[in-house]
Amino acid sequence: MRQYLLDTNVLIDYLTLREPFGATAAALLRAGAVGKVRFYAASLSFVTIEYIIRRQTSTAQARQLLEQLAHVVEIVPVGAVTVRQALASDFTDFEDAIQYFTALTQPTIQAIITRDPKGFRASSLPVLSVAGALLELDNAA
């Protein structure tokens, strides 16, 4: 079974069905529901997602969506070591660095799925687009 860390942008696309990315993000998350893949998300992503969705809808709606998401992904805590690693890294985007070093805390994570692969140029893990992850899962079947 493949194991991926989902970047915050993919999770927002999925939860909000943001065009034109929402449909492919939903297709990817459905693969997890049928046991083809296991998904992880950084705990920090939940904070960011709540802030963004709350501004578009309501606090209650944001919390409801996050509760649903918590059943679909394994939440990986972001700790002090991860923050220090991100601060000392060559990543130009701090949030991407947090995602990357969070992924490294879980040795079973095989890739990071993002809509912004340029943000992960310093990554030693493979970085896939949502479409690339779907293709990889189809080829593994």
Where are these regions (language model features)?
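Short, well-structured N-terminal submotif of metal-dependent ribonuclease cores
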Residues: 1-41, 54-64, 122, 132-141
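Short acidic-hydrophobic, aromatic-tinged amphipathic segments that line or gate anion-handling sites
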Residues: 75-78, 127-131
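Short loop/helix-cap segments at secondary-structure boundaries that form the rim of catalytic
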Residues: 118-125
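A general alpha-helix detector
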Residues: 10-11, 47-49, 82-85
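Helix-adjacent hinge/juxtasegments
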Residues: 51-77
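Hydrophobic helix-cap positions at the C-terminus of alpha-helices
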Residues: 31-32, 69, 106
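Active-site neighborhoods of divalent-metal-dependent phosphate/nucleic-acid chemistry enzymes
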Residues: 74-117
